[in-house]
Amino acid sequence: MDYQDTDECEPIHTSEGTWNVLLAHVNLKKKTKASQASGVYTLIEMVSKDVLAVIKKLDDAGFEVAIVGGAVRGLISGEKVSDWDLTTSARPEQILKLFPSSFYNNRFGTVGVKLTEKVVEITTYRKEQKYSDSRHPDIVVWGETLEEDLARRDFTTNAMALRFAQGKLSKISILNSQLSNFDLVDPYDGQKDLKAKLIRTVGDANQRFGEDALRLLRAVRIANDLGFEIEPSTRKAIGDNAVSIKKISGERIRDEIFKIIDSKNCDKGILLLRDVGLLAQILPELDVCFDVPQKSPKRHHVFDVGTHCVMSLANCPSKKTVVRFATLLHDIGKAKVASVTDEGVRTFYNHEVVGSRQVRDIAKRLSLSKTDREKLFRLVRWHQFSVDERQTDRALRRFIRNAELENVEDMMDLRVGDRLGGGLQQPESWRLKLFRQRLKEVLKKPFTVADLKVSGNDVMKILGISPGPKVGEVLKKLFEEVVDDNKKNNKEYLLKKIASFK
């Protein structure tokens, strides 16, 4: 849904008193039945009906409840909110009693309540505590007030809450949500930073990052997502504490990196990671590439290797995260093999081989799945494929076998990013277009083990063996012969070949 600010405003009750906040009311370009007469929507009218039902149930039971985090930021900014987080005075066991189908599998007071399509997370008020591992509090202590809970949060724009006046929800119809009795609680001037487009920590930045080192990455990711700047003292603290990101698990780091890679401003996000000193800690193999120039005679590249990798990512048409990641990393091997000839030409021989080994290490470090590890490896290892129009069908089949059939289109997307990220104007050369067409033609011919004129039964019968790995090994060898010479895919020849394995 598309929102825009309205020129009208009405009082909003906050913990500081009554403010006239323009952003508290938004004018929807796309009208719905509610408030269609005026076209003006209050914050409460933008809250999901399912979420309101959860809030009402907690309120009816006598508990304080508030919307917190990014949802409040989104509501104030007039954005569509899809992820809802609530905080409450109710303890986890009390929440579970109210919502029997909910789940609670952590020690940090967060209960997941299933809605129609999503899950709303409800967290009990908590107090600040010591974080020895830079990730989790040593002990969890329940708080008594919303203000205590907001004091422990990461950034000012996430430390705002939409608190509902207790006992005022009983008369509300969830189907026609009209409500003005709420407090926009903003003790750390989150609205001010939101308007100024700044990411700033709540309180002392070094303390906040010391409590949870993942916040270092989150600051960059949120700033990148929103198009915000990081406030100077917060930015300095990120650099000062960058090394502590290594205390965070590979899975958590991966998730934040992937969100940046998939974002609209992915290139700016990666460069921001480098500028604040985080890239050197999480992807040092890429960070060193910014010091490796490529411009030289007989080379089309105009960027250093690191900038080229980032620009390639920005121009990669694929929506697959692992393909975009491979595009970002495709040339990291160049930093290790860079050389200059006597004529001044820069060379990077076998960088794809070296780079493929590096991405195996990166994939392991970031706990990628086995499938993603293999795809990442193959895309980097074989990204230097030739599109020479004089190649034989046999050479094309070899390329497909090396890259693997399911990766062929992904390899094309990487090449498009590679070309545009190198300063070329066209996503595809005529040779690449011809290469694509020839691949399609080659793929129309028999190309899998299932296309062989013999089967596993033939192998077992001739060799007198039972089902097992040996059958697959023989079929694979036969397939490799047929790939190189399609004329050999006839039953008589293949049966004789099977017999030769006795």
PLM region spans:
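Catalytic cores of the polymerase beta-like nucleotidyltransferase superfamily
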Residues: 2-3, 7-9, 15, 19-502
